[in-house]
Curated annotation (Swiss-Prot):
Residues 216-249, 264-304, 347-410, 631-684 are annotated as: Disordered. A motif (Nuclear localization signal (NLS)) lies at residues 708-712. It comes from Mus musculus (Mouse). The lineage of its organism: Eukaryota, Metazoa, Chordata, Craniata, Vertebrata. The modification Phosphoserine is found at residues 52, 286, 289-290, 394, 407, 1076, 1563, 1566. Homodimer. Interacts with ARFGEF2/BIG2; both proteins are probably part of the same or very similar macromolecular complexes. Interacts with FKBP2. Interacts with MYO9B. Interacts with PRKAR1A and PRKAR2A. Interacts with PPP1CC. Interacts with NCL, FBL, NUP62 and U3 small nucleolar RNA. Interacts with DPY30. Interacts with PDE3A. Interacts with KANK1. Interacts with TBC1D22A and TBC1D22B. Residues 688-877 form the SEC7 domain. GO terms for cellular component: cytosol; Golgi membrane; nuclear matrix; nucleolus; nucleoplasm; perinuclear region of cytoplasm; small nuclear ribonucleoprotein complex; trans-Golgi network. This is Brefeldin A-inhibited guanine nucleotide-exchange protein 1. Residues 2-224 are annotated as: DCB. Residues 554-574 are annotated as: HUS. Residues 264-277, 641-655 have a biased composition (Basic and acidic residues).
Length: 1846
């Protein structure tokens, strides 16, 4: 401490001595100075001698301890300062230098703090006087250079020292002095030093402000923490903790400050050195006590240390040092902030102690953004959010609601903020000072001052901390001062100024855009875009603008924000859209000719334009990168391209200027917004913006329409709901919308239409003219539109105007009525036209004008001076519309070509001036407007952005690639296209994506129809880009894969040409037909034809050069990259791979269909990718295979065998690999996979291919049987197709394999094959049906029989098998999947095959039923017989008569018997299931025109009943009888009686052929229709002859010769009916009496009669045989009725001689007349037997009466009929009948006999006259004897007649 004092004293002593020693001091005018020095030295000496004890040392102002407040201290300080003050005021440079040097050291070491009040000026502190003194040393340009340096040094020390504090005016003064030294000093070193010092001062001023806020925040945090602890410890009573001594200003409003410092820019003198003059009141802020100062010293030390230690003036490198220091300060700050963050400390958001925690790792700006904790926040700034954190976005919204400028409550929370504000504002004002007229002089003070102020502003902005960025005071300062300054400088013709303005704008855009929405719009619209769009603007300006844009476009946040905030804002310009369009034009090189640029300039500008476009796209990619899924981790295309990461990195454009690069733009968090964008995301709703954008587009479209046709525009806007329908709505629209064409508005308002008039009235009524003089009112009225040309229209408008003017100004006395105003208005219009129109040569004078208006005021005149004033005003300024922006932009059409560069510059400068005015006016207009700015956060915005701008992008890139060979341009275009494709892909915007990919494909030159010409590097690069796109964006390419794969296909061809290798075309192509293409010398090699390269003759040189240029395409990198697309296909997602495969197949198809040279490149690739992708999940794989399989289907059927062979072989290999993977139960992937084999087999007729398919499948079965599951279906399907082939080897191999499967594979892997069991059986059945190979057929049936054994052995396997068809109950599965297919296929074989195979099939089918039927369920049998009965299905039978007949005779016959056998075997199950069907079937059989079948039918009926009758129920018997009845009725041949010959009847046979017998007799020669029918043997029933050729058919063939065809058919049918009738009679007989047959009985009767024996009465018929006992009497009566009906029909026919003759003549049945004798007799015989049996049956007593009645009637009728017979042979036929009848009657009891005998007696007597045979006579004799006895006519000789008489 003592040491410190010593050094101080040493400094002082040396300095004072040095001053005293100066010779100048000796002079008289310095006496005061001399005296002061001496006093001070004396003082020091005394002090040094005192050697005070240590505790008293504090009194000395030591640098290490803050001095104690005590009077002595002040005196001492004063005492020390006075000599120096006087020294500084001396005019001697040496003395001044010495003094300054000492002061600087004293301040630097903290010996001079100047905290004492200034004794000379109340309210100020000593330090203020010290600084003033130092500043005062600068006397303008003539000041000594050494002194200048010392001043700079001292001021820097003062500003940066941590020991002293200066504020407000004093700070300004220090800054101003350095500023002035920079401007005034002629010494370069001093200038540089001054500039560096300024930079450093500003850094410190702003850094302190930021630091203070940070410290305060920490303090608050500690405080809050302590409070919390306190609360935790003593929850009951808590004391308010002492608040820390924080320094606050008295609540001082912004306005106050503005007034105080209003003068800070106004120079009071014209001297340069006053250019920063400031008249700060000294009392401001002086009440800050030093105690508080002391408190913060320690806090500030951290930041200031770095400065105080560097005595920069002694460091030679003036430029560098300040930058280092700045950097170190900034770094230190960041470290402090980030360090705190790292500790995860919670920072309080408000003094109440609400806790708002900041998460770890959050950005430093986050805290600051939350309104610096602890700072007094004004009311307007306290949002009521539920969140405890105050977010900036909410402040913004608050702000936006408050458009009246800065909120009155806002104030500086700390004096340091005020300092910073004042400095900032001063610099802004300095930068706005205008330059002198004429060309700018780089040395002039004005220009240097402007540049310096801009440089310093840029430096402040670039280093701006959180407080600066968020405090409302600073934001308002930026809006009100900086932006206005920029609008002035932004169009400066001085490149450096312009460049600086741009840099500042960039910084603002980067860090402050949320607050500067309107300002940014003005800057873009009025400066950037204007310069780009104006054809006259200079290259330099364009270049700088585009440089700046390069930077803006490289920042994703900015790009998206521009779109969201301007293009989607109804009231803002479409900046993004215009920007892209302008850049696109520049990139295309449009408009550069007018500028007279050099080619080099044009190219560099184009490149920059492209670079911007590419940057924008990159930003969009970057912005939406989260939505992109990169399929590859590694994506380099050879070494030529950087990896995929390049898309997300932005290329660093070279920095715009030397003022420090804006790294923030390139960093990922991009602009300052990035940090708290998350908090703003609430306001960023993409859908909402999209709606806004649509509305905006509608409005713009409406305005465009309006400007062409007003009504159409209005109608459109109304239809779209954007405009109301009332006149008022429309009028308001016309008022407010500035973009409307003023002429059209005028036309619309002037129109005579009723509605238009209403709008016009509303329009005028919306004006308020009150208090305005007439001309002003008229000017206001005519500002908004251009008056229409027609007088009537003007008339209407003026009339309404006049009325409205008077309405608004009702107190006026000038105009008598509205008429006056109307006429005057009209005259003013005429006057303005007259005076200002160039067409009018003779202008109207004032007198003429006054004269013209005579008497218009109700016949009086208006005052002359009034009219005169009007004339003067109009002469001075014409009435015109207000200039809207649109009118000031010179459009191209109006521009005449500028003659010379000089003229152009002149024109441009004028335009720039105009532009600057507009910009400044607009800036000022918006400086108080608060517009809410949305910070975009959603990646969704990119979609509408891209949709909006994709066309100009595409145009720029296409033109670039098309007409420019510069590699850089090409690579930019390609990069742009890549990004565009990426965006279109990510958002699946298909049209746009396809457009870009097509463009890319087009520039590869691979797909052009004209063929490949010479390739340039850009085309090769395009190919590489296309491949890269395929590689990186494959997931999104969809249909665009088509273009890409087409190119790759062509590329392969190109590579072949390039390398000179002959392409591997497929052999056997079309070449053969046209003769060899390589035959003649003039012809090109084939491959060139393939690429469409050559026409007729060939230029070999050209080909060589093409080969060379294409050679590049074969570079290793390209080949590898192409390959990687295919190998990388495994990384595509499930949908993408399907698209990829689909288009690969399409391209392959095109290759193969090439007429000249089919190629298999893509087909090979398909095989490859199939291998690669086989490992995918099955779901994806099956979708892929659906496409590939379909392709193989087509390719496998290609007429070119080589192609098909390749396809089948590839399929085989793939299948083998696929099958190796196996398959789980219930999956169907194998089935889908193997389907192409089926398709090829089905469609390809080539034996080679079919054979190959079968071989492939056979190979699969042999090697992979264990892995096959659902694939069996396809295998059997292929063999099924092979089975019907005519090629022996194919059938043989297929059958061999099928046999192998059925015998061996089924044995081992039965459960795996169940699913295709049906297919196997079906396949076998197909082999069986191939008539060409009978042995195979028989073997196939044997295998089917074998299959049945599997089903029988393994029913469980079927039960457990689950399949798609889950509706089948488990117990039925064995039927549905096992038995049914077998039996069904056998039935198919029966229905389709030749006789021997058919028969074998039938046998096997019934064998299976008989063998396994015991396991069948009832409902299975129903299904089964539905199949079996198909055998009889008439519709399915062959058409040809002979085949049909054969079929019926053989198969149907066989089946019938077999069915009956099965029925009998399984009667219990089948009786109720099957019986009805069997009867129906039998009924069907007898109806067929086939005798054999008909007979079999009746036979079977008989068999079924006889074998099973005992088990029949009553109901079944009813059915049986009904069936018999039906058959009977149907088969009565009624047509025999009704048939009549047609008119054209053939001649009857010649008389010689006709029998000589009388026609009415049934002679021996007459033919019994049944004669030729073989009688059936008694065992016939057991075994029907399988093949017995119908005898009827022979008869029919006999008939054929004589009868015509229609008759033939009829006669044949009639014959069969007759047969059936007879068969039926026999059947009934058999059913009732079997095994007793009628024949046997007849024979017995005859024998007995012959013997006339006594044992005649042996009762044969009492045996219990036949079914008689099971039939009820009613049923028997039914049968009887049938028999008797049949008998009567035969009788009728036999009696109808005429009809029989006619039939005979027509050729029916042989050489003589037909008869029905057998039917007549046998039906009656059977009937009689039944009746007599019932008559004798004790159990049927109830029916006896009826039986007797029937007997009597039948017998009498029969006898009567017998008596009418004339023919001997006919009577002979009745012999047995009579015997039967008489024998039976003889056997009945006497009582009954009586009744009978008396009934027949007369008839029997009549019979005696016939010549009867002996046997009959014997029986008759007995009959009559019996009559005698019974009627007691005679006595019976007992011994003779053993007849019972009961």
């Amino acid at each position: 401490m003592y040491e410190g004092k010593k050094t101080k004293n040493m400094f002082l002593t040396r300095a004072l001595e040095k001053i005293l020693a100066d010779k100048e001091v000796k002079k008289a005018h310095h006496s005061q100075l001399r005296k002061a020095c001496e006093v001070a030295l004396e003082e020091i000496k005394v002090e040094t001698e005192k050697q005070s004890p240590p505790h008293g040392e504090a009194k000395a102002g030591s640098g290490t301890l803050p001095p104690v407040k005590s009077k002595t201290n002040f005196i001492e300080a004063d005492k020390y300062f006075l000599p120096f003050e006087l020294a500084c005021q001396s005019k001697c440079p040496r003395i001044v230098s010495t003094s300054l040097d000492c002061l600087q050291k004293l301040i630097a070491y903290g010996h001079l703090t100047g905290r004492a009040p200034d004794s000379t000026t109340p309210g100020k502190k000593l330090i203020d006087r010290i600084i003033e003194t130092i500043c005062g040393c600068f006397q303008g340009p003539q000041t000594d250079e050494g002194v200048q340096l010392q001043i700079i040094k001292a001021l820097l020390t003062a500003v940066t020292s941590q020991h002293i504090e200066i504020h407000e005016g004093t700070v300004l003064q220090a800054v101003r002095t350095c500023y002035n030294i920079y401007l005034a000093s002629k010494n370069l070193i001093n200038q540089t030093t001054a500039k560096a010092t300024l930079t450093q001062m500003l850094n410190v001023i702003f850094a302190r402000m930021e630091n203070q806020a940070l410290q305060e925040a920490k303090q608050m945090e500690r405080e809050r923490h302590r409070q919390q602890q306190h609360l935790l410890q003593s929850p009951v009573s808590h004391h308010e903790p002492e608040s820390p001594h924080l320094r606050y200003l008295p609540p001082q409003t912004v306005d106050h400050i503005n007034q105080e410092h209003e003068g800070d820019l106004e120079p009071q003198t014209h001297d340069v050195d006053k250019s920063l003059q400031d008249d700060t009141e000294p009392e401001n802020g002086s009440d800050i006590s030093s105690a508080e100062n002391e408190q913060t010293e320690a806090d500030q030390a951290t930041a200031a240390e770095t400065l105080s230690k560097n005595d920069i003036l002694y460091d030679g490198d003036y430029e560098e040092k300040p930058l280092d220091i700045v950097q170190s300060i900034v770094e230190e700050m960041v470290n402090i902030i980030v360090g705190d963050m790292g500790e995860g400390m919670a920072i309080s958001a408000s003094t109440e102690g609400n806790t708002g925690t900041v998460e770890d790792g959050s950005d430093s700006e986050n805290i600051q953004a939350n309104g610096i904790p602890g700072t007094p926040i004004s009311v307007a700034y306290t949002p009521s959010l539920p969140d405890d954190r105050l977010s900036v976005s909410s402040n913004d919204t608050q702000e936006s609601g408050n458009s009246s400028g800065p909120s009155p409550g806002a104030k500086f929370s700390h004096i340091l903020q005020k300092d910073a504000f004042l400095v900032f504002r001063s610099l802004c004002k300095l930068s706005m000072k205008p330059l002198s007229d004429g060309p700018p002089d780089p040395k002039s003070h004005e220009l240097r001052s402007k540049i310096l102020s801009l440089q310093l502003l840029l430096s402040i902005l670039q280093n701006a901390g959180p407080v600066f960025r968020t405090n409302e005071m600073f934001i308002n300062a930026i809006k009100q001062y900086l932006c206005v300054a920029l609008s002035k400088n932004g169009v400066s013709s001085v490149p450096e100024v312009f460049e600086l303005s741009l840099s500042i704008f960039l910084t603002l855009l980067s860090n402050f855009k949320t607050h500067l929405k309107m300002q940014i719009e003005v800057f873009f619209k009025e400066i950037f875009l204007y310069i780009l769009e104006t054809s006259t603007s200079s290259f330099d300006h364009k270049w700088m603008v585009i440089q700046t844009l390069t930077r803006i476009c490289a920042d994703a946040q900015s790009v998206v924000d521009i779109y969201v905030n301007y293009d989607c804002d109804l009231n803002a310009a479409n900046i993004f859209e215009r920007l892209v369009n302008d850049l696109s034009k520049i990139a295309q090189g449009r408009g550069s000719q007018e500028l007279g640029m050099s080619n080099v300039q044009e190219l560099s500008l184009r490149k920059k334009g492209l670079e911007c476009l590419v940057s924008i796209l990159k930003c969009m990619v970057e912005w939406s990168k989260d939505q992109y899924v990169n399929p590859n981790s590694q994506t380099t295309l050879g070494q030529e391209k950087p990896s995929e990461q390049e898309i997300s990195e932005v290329k660093h454009p070279e920095t715009i200027n030397r003022y420090g690069s804006l790294n923030s733009l390139e960093s990922t968090s991009s602009s300052g917004i990035g940090s708290y964008s998350t908090q703003m995301s609430g306001t960023d709703n993409p859908e909402q913006f999209e709606v806004l954008k649509q509305q905006k587009e509608i409005i713009e479209q409406g305005i465009d329409l309006f400007n062409k046709k007003p009504k159409r525009g209005i109608q459109y806007l109304q239809e779209q709901g954007m405009l109301g329908t009332t006149p008022e709505d429309i009028a308001q629209f016309l008022h407010q919308e500035e973009r409307l064409d003023s002429t059209q508005v005028g036309e619309f308002l002037g129109d005579n239409d009723k509605f238009n008039k209403e709008v016009m009235y509303a329009y005028v009524d919306q004006h308020d003219f009150s208090g305005k003089d007439f001309v002003s009112a008229l000017r206001l009225f005519l500002e908004g539109f251009r008056l229409p040309g027609e007088a009537q229209k003007i008339d209407r408008l003026m009339e309404k105007f006049a009325a409205r003017y008077l309405e608004c100004n009702q107190g006026q006395t000038l105009f008598a009525s509205a008429d006056t105003a109307y006429v005057l208005a009209y005259s003013i219009i005429m006057l303005t036209t007259d005076l200002h129109s160039p067409q009018v040569k003779n202008k109207m004078t004032k007198e003429q004008y006054i004269k013209m208006n005579r008497g218009i005021n109700d016949s009086k005149d208006l005052p002359e001076e009034y009219l005169s004033a009007i004339y003067n005003e109009i002469a001075g300024k014409k009435i015109s519309m207000k200039e809207t922006k649109e009118l000031t932009i010179p459009t191209k059409s109006t521009k005449q070509n500028v003659a010379s560069e000089k003229q152009r510059r002149l024109l441009y400068n004028l335009e720039m001036e105009q532009m600057a005015k507009t910009a400044k006016a607009l800036m000022e207009a918006v400086s108080h407007v608060q517009a809410p700015f949305t910070s975009a956060t959603h990646l969704e915005h990119v979609r509408p952005m891209f949709k909006l701008a994709w066309t100009p992008f595409l145009a720029a890139f296409s033109v670039g690639l098309q007409d420019c060979d510069d590699t850089e341009v090409a690579s930019l275009c390609l990069e742009g296209i890549r990004c565009a494709i990426r965006i279109a892909c990510i958002f699946s915007i298909q049209l746009e994506r396809d457009a870009y990919v097509q463009a890319l494909a087009r520039f590869t030159l691979l797909t052009v129809s004209s063929g490949i010409t010479e390739m340039k590097q850009k085309n090769i690069d395009t190919i590489k880009t296309l491949i890269t796109v395929a590689h990186t964006d494959g997931n999104y390419l969809g249909n665009s894969w088509h273009e890409i794969l087409k190119c790759i296909s062509q590329l392969e061809l190109a590579q072949l040409i390039g390398t000179g290798v002959k392409p591997r075309y497929i052999s056997g192509t079309v070449r053969g037909r046209e003769g060899s293409l390589t035959g003649t010398k003039d012809q090109a090699p084939d491959e060139f034809v393939g690429l469409g390269l050559v026409g007729g003759n060939v230029d070999w040189k050209q080909i060589a050069s093409i080969q060379e240029s294409i050679g590049e395409t074969s570079s290793q990198s390209v080949v590898v990259a192409v390959d990687r697309i295919f190998t990388g296909s495994t990384r595509l997602d499930g949908n993408a791979i399907v698209d990829f495969v689909r288009w690969l197949c399409a391209v392959s198809m095109d290759e193969l269909l090439s007429t000249t040279h089919p190629r298999m490149f893509s087909l090979q690739k398909i095989v490859e990718i199939s291998y690669y992708n086989m490992g995918r999940i099955r779901l994806q794989w099956s979708r892929i295979w659906e496409v590939i399989g379909d392709h193989f289907n087509k390719v496998g059927c290609n007429p070119n065998e080589d192609v098909a062979i390749f396809a089948v072989d590839s399929l085989r290999q793939l299948s083998m690999k696929f099958l190796e993977k196996g398959e789980l139960a219930n999956f169907r992937f194998q089935k889908d996979f193997l389907r192409p084999f089926e398709h090829i087999m089905k469609r390809n007729r080539s034996p080679t291919i079919r054979d190959m398919v079968v071989r492939c499948i056979a190979q699969m079965v042999n090697s992979q049987a264990a892995n096959i599951r659902s694939g069996w279906k396809n295998i059997f399907s292929v063999f099924h197709l092979a089975a019907s082939d005519q090629d022996e080897s194919i059938v043989e191999l297929a059958f061999q394999t099928t046999g192998h499967i059925v015998t061996l594979v089924f044995e081992k892997h039965f459960p795996a094959t169940i699913d295709s069991f049906q297919d196997a059986v079906k396949c076998l059945s197909e082999f069986a049906c191939n008539a060409a190979f009978p042995d195979t057929s028989m073997e196939a049936i044997r295998l089917i029989r074998h299959c049945a054994k599997y089903v029988s052995d393994r029913p469980q396997a079927f039960k457990e098998y689950t399949s798609d068809d889950m509706s089948v109950a488990p117990e039925d599965r064995v039927w549905v999947r096992g038995w049914f297919p077998i039996l069904f296929e056998l039935s198919c074989i029966i229905n389709r095959c030749k006789l021997d195979v058919r028969t074998r099939g039938l046998t096997v089918m019934f064998e299976i039923m008989k063998t396994y039927g015991h396991t069948y369920e009832k409902h299975w049998w129903q299904d089964l017989f539905r199949i079996v009965f198909r055998i009889f299905d008439n519709m399915k039978l062959p058409e040809q008569q002979t085949e049909k007949a054969e079929w019926m005779t053989t198969t149907c016959n066989h089946a019938l018997y077999a069915i009956c056998d099965v029925f009998t075997q399984y009667l219990e199950v089948l009786s109720d299931v099957l019986l009805d069907d069997i009867f129906a079937q039998l009924y069907w059989c007898v109806q067929q025109d086939n005798e054999q079948l008909a007979r079999s039918g009746t036979n079977c009926l008989e068999n079924v009943v006889i074998l099973n009758g005992e088990k029949f129920t009553l109901e079944i018997w009813d059915k049986t009888c009904n069936c018999t009845l039906d058959i009977f009725k149907t088969t009565i041949p009624h047509a025999l009686l009704t048939w009549r010959p047609t008119s054209g009847e053939a001649e009857p046979p010649s008389p010689s052929a006709v029998s000589e017998k009388p026609l009415d007799a049934i002679s021996q020669k007459s033919v019994d229709i049944h004669d030729s029918i073989q009688p059936r043997s008694s065992d016939n029933r057991q075994q029907a002859p399988l093949v017995s050729v119908s005898t009827v058919s022979e008869e029919v063939s006999k008939v054929k010769s004589t009868a015509k065809f229609p008759e033939q058919k009829l006669f044949a049918a009639l014959l069969i009916k007759c047969v059936v009738q007879l068969e039926l009679i026999q059947t009934i007989d058999n059913i009732v009496f079997f095994p007793a047959t009628s024949k046997k009985e007849d024979a017995e009767n005859l024998a007995a009669a012959q013997r006339d024996a006594v044992d005649f009465d042996v009762r044969v018929d009492t045996q219990d045989q036949g079914m008689y006992r099971f039939l009820t009497s009613q049923q028997l009566f039914k049968l009887l009725d049938c028999l008797l009906e049949s008998h009567r029909f035969a009788k009728a026919f036999n009696s109808n001689n005429e009809q029989r003759t006619a039939l005979w003549k027509a050729g029916f049945k042989g050489k003589s007349k037909p008869n029905l004798l057998k039917q007549e007799t046998s039906s009656l015989a059977c009937g009689l037997r039944i009746l007599f049996r019932m008559y004798m049956d004790e159990s049927r007593v109830s029916a006896w009466e009826e039986v007797q009645q029937r007997l009597l009637n039948v017998c009498r009728e029969a006898l009567s009929y017998f008596l009418t017979l004339t023919s001997e042979s006919h009577r002979e036929a009745w012999t047995n009948l009579l015997l039967l009848f008489l024998t039976k009657v003889l056997k009945i009891s006497d009582s009954r006999f009586k009744a009978h005998a008396s009934f027949y007696y007369p008839l029997l007597c009549e019979i005696m006259q016939f010549d009867l045979i002996p046997e009959l006579r014997a029986v008759l004799r007995r009959f009559f004897l019996r009559i005698g006895i019974v009627f007691q006519i005679s006595q019976p000789p007992e011994q003779e007649l053993g007849i019972n008489r009961q």
